[in-house]
């Protein structure tokens, strides 16, 4: 029991004695590397998957203002004032717009 305690205290002493030299070594290494130019970073690889329907850019002009506004806010086909601005929403594929689902 006494020898185990003695060996543990010696290891602790050795570690504490070695710690400042490790710190100094790492600081010297960092200061030495500051003078060297950093290697050029490689660009991240792009995925090899094809672009899908939902992978389009969100900053495109179609996303900002997808449909033209009606003159005087009146639909020329239905003569409805303030109604929906786009095509018939019950067509297949038109139930979702910008991540929002239409619920009637």
Swiss-Prot record:
GO terms for biological process: cellular respiration; innate immune response; mitochondrial respiratory chain complex II assembly; positive regulation of succinate dehydrogenase activity. It is found in: Mitochondrion matrix. GO terms for cellular component: mitochondrial matrix; mitochondrion. Residues 29-104 are annotated as: Disordered. Disulfide bonds: none annotated. Residues 63-83, 91-104 have a biased composition (Basic and acidic residues). GO terms for molecular function: enzyme activator activity. Residues 1-30 form a transit peptide. Keywords: Chaperone, Mitochondrion, Transit peptide. Belongs to the SDHAF4 family. Plays an essential role in the assembly of succinate dehydrogenase (SDH), an enzyme complex (also referred to as respiratory complex II) that is a component of both the tricarboxylic acid (TCA) cycle and the mitochondrial electron transport chain, and which couples the oxidation of succinate to fumarate with the reduction of ubiquinone (coenzyme Q) to ubiquinol. Binds to the flavoprotein subunit Sdha in its FAD-bound form, blocking the generation of excess reactive oxygen species (ROS) and facilitating its assembly with the iron-sulfur protein subunit Sdhb into the SDH catalytic dimer. Interacts with Sdha in its FAD-bound form. This is Succinate dehydrogenase assembly factor 4, mitochondrial.
């Amino acid at each position: 029991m006494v020898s185990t305690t003695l060996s543990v205290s010696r290891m602790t002493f050795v570690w504490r004695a070695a710690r400042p030299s490790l710190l100094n070594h790492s600081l010297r290494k960092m200061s030495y590397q500051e003078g060297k130019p950093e290697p050029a970073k490689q660009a991240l690889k792009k995925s090899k998957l094809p672009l899908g329907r939902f992978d389009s850019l969100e900053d495109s002009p179609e996303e900002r203002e997808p449909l033209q506004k009606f003159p005087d806010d009146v639909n020329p086909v239905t003569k409805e004032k303030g109604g929906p601005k786009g095509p018939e929403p019950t067509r297949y594929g038109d139930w979702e717009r910008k991540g929002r689902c239409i619920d009637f």
